[in-house]
Amino acid sequence: MNFTPNFKPDGTICDWLNKHAELSPDKICYQFSNGDSDLTWSALFDKVNKIAKYLVKLNINKGDSIAICMSNGRPALQIFYAILYGGFRVTPLNLAAGPAALGHAISHSKCKHIFVDDPQLETLNNALLETDTNPKIINVSNSLIEETDPSIKLHDISPNDHALLMYTSGTTGVPKGVIHTHSSLLAGGWTTAVAHNLQSSDRALCVLPLYHINGLCVTVIAPLISGGSSVICPKFSNSNFWTDCEKFKITWFSVVPTIISHLLHGKNDPSEITKKRLRFGRSASAPLAVDTQSSFEKRFGVPIIETMGLTETAAQILSNPLPPGQRKIGSPGIAFGNKVKIVLPNGDDQINNTIGEIAVKGPNVMLEYLDNYEASQKTFTNDGWLLTGDLGYIDNDGYVFVSGRLKELIIKGGENISPREIDDALYAHKDVIEAAAFAIPCDIYGQRIEAAVKLTKNSKAIEAEFLNLCYSKLGKFKAPDKIHFMDELPKGPSGKIQRIKLLDVTDGLNKNKVY
Protein backbone atom coordinates (compact mmCIF):
# COMPACT_ATOMS: atom_id res chain seq x y z
CA MET A 1 0.00 0.00 0.00
CA ASN A 2 1.57 3.19 -1.23
CA PHE A 3 0.24 6.66 -1.97
CA THR A 4 0.01 7.09 -5.73
CA PRO A 5 -1.86 9.91 -7.50
CA ASN A 6 -3.29 7.63 -10.20
CA PHE A 7 -4.83 4.89 -8.06
CA LYS A 8 -7.17 5.11 -5.09
CA PRO A 9 -5.79 3.55 -1.90
CA ASP A 10 -6.39 -0.13 -1.20
CA GLY A 11 -7.16 -1.78 2.11
CA THR A 12 -8.63 -0.32 5.28
CA ILE A 13 -7.72 2.54 7.57
CA CYS A 14 -6.32 -0.10 9.92
CA ASP A 15 -4.02 -1.41 7.17
CA TRP A 16 -2.61 2.08 6.59
CA LEU A 17 -1.99 2.62 10.30
CA ASN A 18 -0.24 -0.76 10.48
CA LYS A 19 1.95 0.16 7.51
CA HIS A 20 3.13 3.44 8.99
CA ALA A 21 3.74 1.86 12.41
CA GLU A 22 5.92 -0.78 10.76
CA LEU A 23 7.83 1.40 8.28
CA SER A 24 8.03 4.72 10.17
CA PRO A 25 7.49 3.84 13.84
CA ASP A 26 9.26 6.87 15.31
CA LYS A 27 7.87 9.50 12.94
CA ILE A 28 5.55 12.01 14.59
CA CYS A 29 2.13 11.82 12.96
CA TYR A 30 -0.08 13.99 15.18
CA GLN A 31 0.69 16.88 17.50
CA PHE A 32 -1.66 18.89 19.69
CA SER A 33 -1.56 22.61 20.36
CA ASN A 34 -3.31 22.17 23.73
CA GLY A 35 -0.21 20.53 25.23
CA ASP A 36 -1.18 16.87 24.79
CA SER A 37 1.92 14.80 24.08
CA ASP A 38 2.92 14.04 20.49
CA LEU A 39 1.94 10.79 18.82
CA THR A 40 4.30 8.73 16.70
CA TRP A 41 2.91 6.09 14.39
CA SER A 42 4.04 3.31 16.74
CA ALA A 43 2.62 5.05 19.82
CA LEU A 44 -0.70 5.57 18.04
CA PHE A 45 -0.72 1.92 16.92
CA ASP A 46 -0.07 0.66 20.47
CA LYS A 47 -2.70 2.88 22.09
CA VAL A 48 -5.32 2.17 19.43
CA ASN A 49 -4.83 -1.59 19.80
CA LYS A 50 -5.37 -1.42 23.55
CA ILE A 51 -8.54 0.68 23.24
CA ALA A 52 -9.87 -1.55 20.43
CA LYS A 53 -9.40 -4.63 22.62
CA TYR A 54 -11.21 -2.84 25.43
CA LEU A 55 -14.16 -2.30 23.07
CA VAL A 56 -14.18 -5.92 21.91
CA LYS A 57 -14.20 -7.03 25.55
CA LEU A 58 -17.43 -5.04 26.00
CA ASN A 59 -19.04 -7.54 23.57
CA ILE A 60 -19.99 -4.85 21.06
CA ASN A 61 -21.04 -6.40 17.76
CA LYS A 62 -18.95 -5.78 14.67
CA GLY A 63 -20.28 -2.79 12.73
CA ASP A 64 -22.21 -1.31 15.65
CA SER A 65 -22.09 2.46 16.09
CA ILE A 66 -19.97 3.89 18.89
CA ALA A 67 -20.41 7.63 19.40
CA ILE A 68 -17.82 10.24 20.34
CA CYS A 69 -18.87 13.40 22.19
CA MET A 70 -15.47 14.98 22.74
CA SER A 71 -13.40 18.07 22.06
CA ASN A 72 -10.47 18.06 19.63
CA GLY A 73 -7.40 16.51 21.23
CA ARG A 74 -5.32 13.39 21.61
CA PRO A 75 -7.98 11.30 23.43
CA ALA A 76 -10.61 11.96 20.74
CA LEU A 77 -8.19 11.11 17.94
CA GLN A 78 -7.09 7.86 19.58
CA ILE A 79 -10.67 6.76 20.19
CA PHE A 80 -11.61 7.58 16.59
CA TYR A 81 -8.90 5.27 15.29
CA ALA A 82 -9.62 2.60 17.93
CA ILE A 83 -13.30 2.34 17.03
CA LEU A 84 -12.34 1.72 13.40
CA TYR A 85 -9.54 -0.62 14.39
CA GLY A 86 -11.90 -2.72 16.46
CA GLY A 87 -14.29 -3.20 13.55
CA PHE A 88 -16.96 -0.76 14.70
CA ARG A 89 -18.61 2.29 13.15
CA VAL A 90 -17.52 5.64 14.56
CA THR A 91 -20.29 8.21 15.06
CA PRO A 92 -18.90 11.67 15.90
CA LEU A 93 -21.52 13.85 17.58
CA ASN A 94 -21.76 17.43 16.38
CA LEU A 95 -21.15 19.47 19.52
CA ALA A 96 -22.68 22.58 17.94
CA ALA A 97 -25.90 20.91 16.79
CA GLY A 98 -28.05 21.44 19.88
CA PRO A 99 -29.73 18.86 22.16
CA ALA A 100 -32.53 17.84 19.78
CA ALA A 101 -30.22 17.08 16.85
CA LEU A 102 -27.76 15.26 19.11
CA GLY A 103 -30.56 13.26 20.66
CA HIS A 104 -31.74 12.30 17.19
CA ALA A 105 -28.24 11.14 16.22
CA ILE A 106 -27.92 9.04 19.38
CA SER A 107 -31.32 7.39 18.83
CA HIS A 108 -31.08 7.00 15.07
CA SER A 109 -27.56 5.53 15.12
CA LYS A 110 -28.65 2.95 17.72
CA CYS A 111 -25.34 3.50 19.48
CA LYS A 112 -25.08 1.69 22.81
CA HIS A 113 -21.79 3.28 23.87
CA ILE A 114 -20.72 6.93 23.91
CA PHE A 115 -17.29 8.30 24.72
CA VAL A 116 -17.30 11.70 26.41
CA ASP A 117 -14.84 14.00 28.16
CA ASP A 118 -15.54 16.31 31.09
CA PRO A 119 -15.87 19.51 28.98
CA GLN A 120 -18.67 17.92 26.92
CA LEU A 121 -20.47 16.05 29.68
CA GLU A 122 -23.19 18.69 30.04
CA THR A 123 -23.70 18.75 26.26
CA LEU A 124 -24.19 14.99 26.27
CA ASN A 125 -26.49 14.97 29.29
CA ASN A 126 -28.74 17.57 27.65
CA ALA A 127 -28.84 15.50 24.47
CA LEU A 128 -29.77 12.35 26.37
CA LEU A 129 -32.87 14.14 27.67
CA GLU A 130 -34.06 14.19 24.05
CA THR A 131 -33.86 10.42 23.58
CA ASP A 132 -35.43 7.32 25.12
CA THR A 133 -32.28 5.25 24.68
CA ASN A 134 -29.91 4.40 27.50
CA PRO A 135 -26.38 4.03 26.08
CA LYS A 136 -23.36 3.24 28.24
CA ILE A 137 -21.39 6.45 28.88
CA ILE A 138 -17.60 6.12 29.02
CA ASN A 139 -15.95 9.24 30.43
CA VAL A 140 -12.36 9.28 29.21
CA SER A 141 -11.49 11.91 31.80
CA ASN A 142 -11.77 9.39 34.64
CA SER A 143 -11.73 5.94 33.01
CA LEU A 144 -8.88 3.64 32.02
CA ILE A 145 -9.93 2.56 28.55
CA GLU A 146 -7.39 0.00 27.45
CA GLU A 147 -6.95 -3.76 27.50
CA THR A 148 -3.71 -5.71 27.10
CA ASP A 149 -4.99 -9.30 27.22
CA PRO A 150 -3.32 -11.00 24.22
CA SER A 151 -6.13 -13.55 23.98
CA ILE A 152 -8.63 -10.90 22.85
CA LYS A 153 -8.96 -11.01 19.08
CA LEU A 154 -10.11 -8.04 17.03
CA HIS A 155 -12.76 -8.38 14.35
CA ASP A 156 -11.66 -8.95 10.78
CA ILE A 157 -12.20 -5.82 8.70
CA SER A 158 -12.67 -5.37 4.94
CA PRO A 159 -12.59 -2.21 2.78
CA ASN A 160 -16.36 -2.28 2.29
CA ASP A 161 -17.19 -2.45 6.00
CA HIS A 162 -18.90 0.56 7.54
CA ALA A 163 -16.38 2.97 9.07
CA LEU A 164 -18.13 6.30 9.67
CA LEU A 165 -21.66 7.44 10.42
CA MET A 166 -21.71 11.23 10.34
CA TYR A 167 -24.85 13.33 10.52
CA THR A 168 -25.55 16.27 8.24
CA SER A 169 -26.19 19.68 9.77
CA GLY A 170 -29.93 19.35 9.25
CA THR A 171 -30.50 23.03 8.46
CA THR A 172 -33.39 22.12 6.15
CA GLY A 173 -34.82 19.16 8.05
CA VAL A 174 -33.93 16.23 10.28
CA PRO A 175 -30.19 15.44 10.10
CA LYS A 176 -29.41 12.48 7.85
CA GLY A 177 -26.86 9.83 8.77
CA VAL A 178 -24.18 9.53 6.08
CA ILE A 179 -22.48 6.12 5.90
CA HIS A 180 -18.88 5.85 4.70
CA THR A 181 -16.89 2.66 4.35
CA HIS A 182 -13.18 2.25 5.02
CA SER A 183 -12.72 2.46 1.26
CA SER A 184 -14.62 5.73 0.75
CA LEU A 185 -13.00 7.37 3.79
CA LEU A 186 -9.54 6.51 2.48
CA ALA A 187 -10.55 7.82 -0.95
CA GLY A 188 -11.64 11.08 0.66
CA GLY A 189 -8.20 11.55 2.16
CA TRP A 190 -6.60 10.47 -1.11
CA THR A 191 -8.41 13.06 -3.26
CA THR A 192 -7.11 15.76 -0.91
CA ALA A 193 -3.57 14.37 -0.95
CA VAL A 194 -3.60 14.17 -4.76
CA ALA A 195 -4.99 17.66 -5.32
CA HIS A 196 -2.48 19.27 -2.95
CA ASN A 197 0.48 17.04 -3.81
CA LEU A 198 0.93 16.20 -0.14
CA GLN A 199 4.27 14.69 0.86
CA SER A 200 5.51 12.89 3.96
CA SER A 201 7.31 16.12 4.91
CA ASP A 202 4.09 18.17 4.97
CA ARG A 203 2.45 19.21 8.22
CA ALA A 204 -1.16 20.44 8.38
CA LEU A 205 -2.80 22.74 10.90
CA CYS A 206 -6.27 21.51 11.90
CA VAL A 207 -8.44 24.19 13.50
CA LEU A 208 -11.76 22.62 12.47
CA PRO A 209 -13.66 20.13 14.65
CA LEU A 210 -12.98 16.44 14.10
CA TYR A 211 -16.73 15.81 14.19
CA HIS A 212 -16.94 17.68 10.87
CA ILE A 213 -16.00 15.94 7.60
CA ASN A 214 -13.53 18.68 6.65
CA GLY A 215 -11.55 18.45 9.87
CA LEU A 216 -11.67 14.65 9.84
CA CYS A 217 -10.91 13.70 6.24
CA VAL A 218 -8.75 16.62 5.17
CA THR A 219 -6.44 16.96 8.17
CA VAL A 220 -6.59 13.45 9.70
CA ILE A 221 -7.11 10.98 6.85
CA ALA A 222 -5.13 12.83 4.16
CA PRO A 223 -1.92 12.77 6.26
CA LEU A 224 -2.58 9.06 6.91
CA ILE A 225 -2.47 8.55 3.13
CA SER A 226 0.51 10.79 2.42
CA GLY A 227 2.50 9.79 5.50
CA GLY A 228 2.63 13.41 6.60
CA SER A 229 1.55 14.86 9.92
CA SER A 230 -1.07 17.14 11.42
CA VAL A 231 -1.27 19.53 14.36
CA ILE A 232 -4.72 19.44 15.94
CA CYS A 233 -6.01 22.51 17.77
CA PRO A 234 -8.96 22.57 20.19
CA LYS A 235 -10.61 25.18 17.96
CA PHE A 236 -9.80 28.17 15.78
CA SER A 237 -8.12 31.06 17.59
CA ASN A 238 -7.38 34.27 15.71
CA SER A 239 -4.70 35.21 18.23
CA ASN A 240 -2.96 31.81 18.11
CA PHE A 241 -3.27 30.90 14.43
CA TRP A 242 -0.07 32.38 13.01
CA THR A 243 1.84 31.61 16.22
CA ASP A 244 0.89 27.94 15.89
CA CYS A 245 1.89 27.96 12.22
CA GLU A 246 5.36 29.15 13.24
CA LYS A 247 5.74 27.01 16.37
CA PHE A 248 4.83 23.74 14.65
CA LYS A 249 6.45 24.53 11.27
CA ILE A 250 3.14 24.19 9.41
CA THR A 251 3.30 23.79 5.61
CA TRP A 252 -0.46 23.99 4.89
CA PHE A 253 -3.74 24.62 6.65
CA SER A 254 -7.41 23.88 6.07
CA VAL A 255 -10.01 26.51 7.01
CA VAL A 256 -13.39 27.90 5.94
CA PRO A 257 -14.18 31.33 4.43
CA THR A 258 -15.30 32.86 7.73
CA ILE A 259 -11.91 32.02 9.26
CA ILE A 260 -10.11 33.57 6.29
CA SER A 261 -12.17 36.72 6.75
CA HIS A 262 -11.45 36.83 10.51
CA LEU A 263 -7.70 36.42 9.91
CA LEU A 264 -7.83 39.14 7.26
CA HIS A 265 -9.46 41.57 9.69
CA GLY A 266 -7.23 40.53 12.60
CA LYS A 267 -4.16 42.34 13.89
CA ASN A 268 -1.64 39.50 13.63
CA ASP A 269 0.60 38.64 10.69
CA PRO A 270 2.76 35.58 10.03
CA SER A 271 6.51 35.92 10.28
CA GLU A 272 8.54 35.93 7.08
CA ILE A 273 9.85 32.43 7.75
CA THR A 274 6.27 31.20 8.26
CA LYS A 275 5.18 32.78 4.97
CA LYS A 276 8.01 31.04 3.14
CA ARG A 277 7.25 27.68 4.73
CA LEU A 278 3.49 27.74 4.05
CA ARG A 279 2.82 26.18 0.66
CA PHE A 280 -0.88 27.04 0.69
CA GLY A 281 -4.02 27.49 2.72
CA ARG A 282 -7.10 25.49 1.82
CA SER A 283 -10.63 26.91 1.88
CA ALA A 284 -13.74 24.73 1.81
CA SER A 285 -17.28 24.19 3.15
CA ALA A 286 -18.67 27.39 1.60
CA PRO A 287 -17.90 29.68 -1.36
CA LEU A 288 -15.03 32.12 -0.79
CA ALA A 289 -15.69 35.73 -1.77
CA VAL A 290 -13.36 36.92 -4.53
CA ASP A 291 -12.42 40.15 -2.73
CA THR A 292 -11.70 38.27 0.50
CA GLN A 293 -9.36 35.82 -1.24
CA SER A 294 -7.51 38.53 -3.15
CA SER A 295 -7.09 40.70 -0.05
CA PHE A 296 -5.88 37.76 2.05
CA GLU A 297 -3.24 36.77 -0.47
CA LYS A 298 -2.09 40.36 -0.91
CA ARG A 299 -1.69 40.92 2.83
CA PHE A 300 -0.26 37.58 3.96
CA GLY A 301 1.48 36.29 0.84
CA VAL A 302 -0.05 32.81 1.27
CA PRO A 303 -1.93 31.35 -1.72
CA ILE A 304 -5.46 30.17 -0.95
CA ILE A 305 -6.69 27.07 -2.74
CA GLU A 306 -10.47 27.13 -2.94
CA THR A 307 -12.07 23.69 -2.86
CA MET A 308 -15.51 22.14 -2.51
CA GLY A 309 -16.73 19.08 -0.66
CA LEU A 310 -19.61 17.45 1.19
CA THR A 311 -20.15 15.09 4.09
CA GLU A 312 -21.52 12.70 1.46
CA THR A 313 -18.22 12.73 -0.47
CA ALA A 314 -15.81 12.32 2.47
CA ALA A 315 -14.91 15.99 1.98
CA GLN A 316 -13.31 16.94 -1.31
CA ILE A 317 -15.04 16.97 -4.69
CA LEU A 318 -13.18 19.81 -6.39
CA SER A 319 -9.97 21.76 -5.91
CA ASN A 320 -7.99 24.40 -7.70
CA PRO A 321 -4.51 23.25 -8.71
CA LEU A 322 -1.55 24.39 -6.65
CA PRO A 323 0.64 27.18 -8.03
CA PRO A 324 2.08 27.34 -10.62
CA GLY A 325 -1.03 25.56 -11.95
CA GLN A 326 -3.92 27.73 -13.04
CA ARG A 327 -6.16 28.84 -10.21
CA LYS A 328 -9.44 30.53 -11.05
CA ILE A 329 -10.49 32.93 -8.32
CA GLY A 330 -14.19 32.42 -7.64
CA SER A 331 -14.15 28.74 -8.65
CA PRO A 332 -13.60 25.72 -6.37
CA GLY A 333 -11.68 24.19 -9.24
CA ILE A 334 -11.68 20.85 -11.01
CA ALA A 335 -12.13 17.22 -10.03
CA PHE A 336 -9.23 15.21 -8.60
CA GLY A 337 -9.80 11.47 -8.30
CA ASN A 338 -13.51 11.66 -9.10
CA LYS A 339 -15.84 12.97 -11.81
CA VAL A 340 -18.23 15.91 -11.88
CA LYS A 341 -20.96 16.98 -14.27
CA ILE A 342 -23.89 19.36 -14.43
CA VAL A 343 -27.42 17.97 -14.52
CA LEU A 344 -29.92 20.34 -16.12
CA PRO A 345 -33.49 20.78 -14.79
CA ASN A 346 -34.87 18.51 -17.53
CA GLY A 347 -32.46 15.74 -16.52
CA ASP A 348 -30.09 16.22 -19.45
CA ASP A 349 -26.35 16.34 -18.91
CA GLN A 350 -24.23 19.43 -19.00
CA ILE A 351 -23.76 22.03 -21.66
CA ASN A 352 -20.71 24.15 -20.91
CA ASN A 353 -21.50 27.44 -19.18
CA THR A 354 -25.10 26.39 -18.48
CA ILE A 355 -26.31 26.40 -14.87
CA GLY A 356 -27.65 23.18 -13.41
CA GLU A 357 -27.15 20.91 -10.41
CA ILE A 358 -23.62 19.72 -9.70
CA ALA A 359 -23.31 15.92 -9.58
CA VAL A 360 -20.34 13.78 -8.56
CA LYS A 361 -19.26 10.17 -8.97
CA GLY A 362 -16.16 8.56 -7.49
CA PRO A 363 -14.63 6.27 -4.86
CA ASN A 364 -15.11 8.86 -2.10
CA VAL A 365 -18.91 8.96 -2.42
CA MET A 366 -20.95 7.67 0.53
CA LEU A 367 -22.64 4.30 0.59
CA GLU A 368 -26.09 5.62 1.56
CA TYR A 369 -28.08 7.45 4.23
CA LEU A 370 -28.71 5.22 7.23
CA ASP A 371 -32.29 3.88 7.31
CA ASN A 372 -33.46 6.52 4.85
CA TYR A 373 -34.19 4.81 1.56
CA GLU A 374 -36.23 7.70 0.18
CA ALA A 375 -33.48 10.28 0.73
CA SER A 376 -30.86 7.93 -0.70
CA GLN A 377 -32.98 7.37 -3.82
CA LYS A 378 -33.46 11.11 -4.33
CA THR A 379 -29.77 11.82 -3.89
CA PHE A 380 -28.48 9.28 -6.42
CA THR A 381 -29.37 9.17 -10.11
CA ASN A 382 -30.18 5.84 -11.75
CA ASP A 383 -26.63 5.62 -13.08
CA GLY A 384 -24.97 6.28 -9.73
CA TRP A 385 -24.24 10.03 -9.73
CA LEU A 386 -24.69 11.83 -6.41
CA LEU A 387 -26.69 15.05 -6.70
CA THR A 388 -25.04 17.64 -4.46
CA GLY A 389 -27.89 20.15 -4.16
CA ASP A 390 -25.51 22.86 -5.38
CA LEU A 391 -26.16 24.90 -8.50
CA GLY A 392 -23.33 25.81 -10.84
CA TYR A 393 -21.78 25.49 -14.27
CA ILE A 394 -18.61 24.18 -15.87
CA ASP A 395 -16.62 26.57 -18.05
CA ASN A 396 -14.74 25.71 -21.23
CA ASP A 397 -11.60 24.81 -19.24
CA GLY A 398 -13.43 22.34 -17.01
CA TYR A 399 -13.56 24.56 -13.92
CA VAL A 400 -16.75 24.49 -11.88
CA PHE A 401 -18.37 27.72 -10.70
CA VAL A 402 -20.94 27.47 -7.90
CA SER A 403 -23.88 29.84 -7.98
CA GLY A 404 -25.61 28.67 -4.79
CA ARG A 405 -27.62 25.98 -3.06
CA LEU A 406 -30.85 24.84 -4.66
CA LYS A 407 -32.67 25.25 -1.34
CA GLU A 408 -31.20 28.74 -0.78
CA LEU A 409 -31.99 30.16 -4.22
CA ILE A 410 -33.94 33.42 -4.00
CA ILE A 411 -36.85 33.63 -6.44
CA LYS A 412 -37.99 37.25 -6.69
CA GLY A 413 -40.75 38.04 -9.15
CA GLY A 414 -40.02 34.79 -10.98
CA GLU A 415 -36.31 35.62 -11.37
CA ASN A 416 -33.71 33.28 -9.86
CA ILE A 417 -31.14 35.19 -7.79
CA SER A 418 -28.08 33.57 -6.28
CA PRO A 419 -27.49 34.84 -2.72
CA ARG A 420 -23.77 34.45 -3.33
CA GLU A 421 -23.86 37.37 -5.79
CA ILE A 422 -25.12 39.59 -2.99
CA ASP A 423 -22.65 38.15 -0.46
CA ASP A 424 -19.75 38.95 -2.79
CA ALA A 425 -20.96 42.52 -3.28
CA LEU A 426 -21.11 43.05 0.49
CA TYR A 427 -17.66 41.52 1.06
CA ALA A 428 -16.25 44.23 -1.20
CA HIS A 429 -16.75 46.67 1.70
CA LYS A 430 -13.58 46.93 3.77
CA ASP A 431 -15.40 46.61 7.12
CA VAL A 432 -17.33 43.41 6.37
CA ILE A 433 -16.11 40.29 8.17
CA GLU A 434 -19.17 38.10 7.53
CA ALA A 435 -22.07 38.54 5.12
CA ALA A 436 -25.06 36.51 3.97
CA ALA A 437 -28.13 37.36 1.92
CA PHE A 438 -31.39 35.49 2.39
CA ALA A 439 -34.99 35.40 1.17
CA ILE A 440 -37.99 36.89 2.95
CA PRO A 441 -41.58 36.02 1.94
CA CYS A 442 -43.31 38.87 0.10
CA ASP A 443 -46.92 39.26 -1.06
CA ILE A 444 -45.96 41.02 -4.29
CA TYR A 445 -42.72 39.36 -5.46
CA GLY A 446 -43.08 35.99 -3.73
CA GLN A 447 -39.73 36.61 -2.09
CA ARG A 448 -37.61 39.66 -1.43
CA ILE A 449 -34.03 40.03 -0.26
CA GLU A 450 -32.43 40.98 3.03
CA ALA A 451 -28.86 40.51 4.22
CA ALA A 452 -26.93 40.27 7.47
CA VAL A 453 -23.39 41.47 8.09
CA LYS A 454 -20.80 41.39 10.84
CA LEU A 455 -18.49 44.41 10.79
CA THR A 456 -15.05 45.15 12.14
CA LYS A 457 -14.84 46.56 15.65
CA ASN A 458 -15.47 50.32 15.82
CA SER A 459 -16.79 50.44 12.24
CA LYS A 460 -18.84 53.57 11.57
CA ALA A 461 -20.46 52.18 8.42
CA ILE A 462 -24.23 52.67 8.08
CA GLU A 463 -26.91 50.74 6.20
CA ALA A 464 -27.05 53.19 3.29
CA GLU A 465 -23.42 52.44 2.41
CA PHE A 466 -24.16 48.76 1.90
CA LEU A 467 -27.39 49.33 0.02
CA ASN A 468 -25.67 51.76 -2.34
CA LEU A 469 -22.77 49.34 -2.79
CA CYS A 470 -25.20 46.60 -3.80
CA TYR A 471 -27.11 48.97 -6.10
CA SER A 472 -23.89 49.84 -7.91
CA LYS A 473 -22.72 46.24 -8.28
CA LEU A 474 -26.00 44.40 -8.77
CA GLY A 475 -28.72 46.86 -9.70
CA LYS A 476 -31.70 47.63 -7.51
CA PHE A 477 -33.69 44.48 -8.32
CA LYS A 478 -31.03 42.14 -6.90
CA ALA A 479 -29.99 44.43 -4.05
CA PRO A 480 -31.27 43.73 -0.53
CA ASP A 481 -34.07 45.85 0.93
CA LYS A 482 -32.59 45.77 4.42
CA ILE A 483 -29.23 45.16 6.10
CA HIS A 484 -29.08 43.57 9.56
CA PHE A 485 -26.02 44.32 11.69
CA MET A 486 -25.11 41.35 13.89
CA ASP A 487 -22.36 40.47 16.35
CA GLU A 488 -22.21 36.95 14.90
CA LEU A 489 -23.99 35.23 12.04
CA PRO A 490 -25.31 31.72 12.79
CA LYS A 491 -22.79 29.08 11.79
CA GLY A 492 -22.49 25.31 11.64
CA PRO A 493 -19.72 23.19 13.16
CA SER A 494 -17.18 24.00 10.43
CA GLY A 495 -17.82 27.74 10.63
CA LYS A 496 -20.02 27.80 7.53
CA ILE A 497 -22.70 30.49 7.74
CA GLN A 498 -26.16 28.93 8.01
CA ARG A 499 -28.15 31.19 5.75
CA ILE A 500 -31.53 29.60 6.44
CA LYS A 501 -31.26 30.29 10.19
CA LEU A 502 -31.06 34.02 9.50
CA LEU A 503 -34.84 33.97 9.11
CA ASP A 504 -35.15 33.04 12.77
CA VAL A 505 -32.54 35.38 14.23
CA THR A 506 -33.35 38.62 12.41
CA ASP A 507 -36.38 40.87 12.63
CA GLY A 508 -36.83 40.87 8.88
CA LEU A 509 -39.47 38.16 8.61
CA ASN A 510 -42.90 39.71 8.21
CA LYS A 511 -45.10 37.71 5.90
CA ASN A 512 -47.89 40.26 5.92
CA LYS A 513 -45.84 43.29 5.01
CA VAL A 514 -46.14 44.48 1.41
CA TYR A 515 -43.10 45.84 -0.44
What are these regions (language model features)?
Residues I250-V255, L264-R327, K341:
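Gly/Ser/Thr-rich phosphate-binding loop
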Residues D38-A43, A163-A187:
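Conserved AMP-binding A3 loop
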Residues D26-G73, L77-Y81, G98-G103:
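Conserved AMP-binding/adenylate-forming core of the ANL superfamily
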Residues A97, I114, G362, L367-E368, ...:
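AMP-binding/adenylate-forming catalytic core of the ANL superfamily
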Residues F45-K53, P159, V178-Q199, A204-V207, ...:
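Conserved structural elements of the adenylate-forming
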Residues L186-R203, I213-T251, G266-K267:
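Conserved AMP-binding/adenylation subdomain of ANL enzymes
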Residues P25-D26, D149-Y167, V174, N197-R203:
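Conserved pre-ATP/AMP-binding loop-to-beta segment of ANL
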Residues I334-G337, D348-T379, E415-I417:
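Conserved ATP/PPi-binding loop(s) of AMP-dependent carboxylate-activating enzymes
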